[in-house]
Regions:
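OB-fold and OB-like single-stranded nucleic-acid-recognition modules
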Residues: 2-135
Length: 135
């Protein structure tokens, strides 16, 4: 009987810990890239750096605050209703994909030049930047 009570208490404690971490801790304890010093670069230069040498670009940009300036190619929404921007040159093999951190509407239009600050998380076919905030 003691064994069953111990297992139930352990499962309840584990569930409570998971709930706290998922819904409370992770909402309040996250990185504030806007307060960090950032690397300032154009969208074209950033995507070119990753195309030229991905390892070298990762050592310079990966998990760092980056302030990117470039032309907006598209504006979309992701599954979490966050605005996503694609910046760079039309027809280029690789561009910069930015997910904005807030759900506020964007006033800029496709074709306009914009500066966004966020955290570079690497490159797939495009360079990925998360937690972006329009400057």
């Amino acid at each position: 009987m003691k064994k069953i009570i111990f297992i139930l208490v352990f499962i309840i404690a584990l569930a409570a810990s998971f709930y706290y971490y998922t819904f409370v801790y992770s909402k309040t304890h996250h990185r504030d890239a806007q307060a960090e010093a950032s690397v300032i670069i154009t969208a074209d230069s950033l995507s070119a750096a990753y195309q030229l040498d991905e390892q070298k670009a990762n050592t310079r940009f990966l998990n760092k605050a980056v302030e990117v300036t470039g032309t907006i190619l598209s504006i979309d929404k992701d599954q979490a209703n966050h605005t996503t921007l694609l910046m760079g040159k039309a027809g280029a093999f690789s561009n910069v994909s930015i997910t904005l951190s807030s759900t506020q509407p964007i006033t800029q239009k496709v074709g306009e030049t914009i500066t966004v600050k966020g955290v570079c998380t690497g490159s797939l076919s495009d360079v990925i930047i998360n937690e972006g905030v329009i400057k």
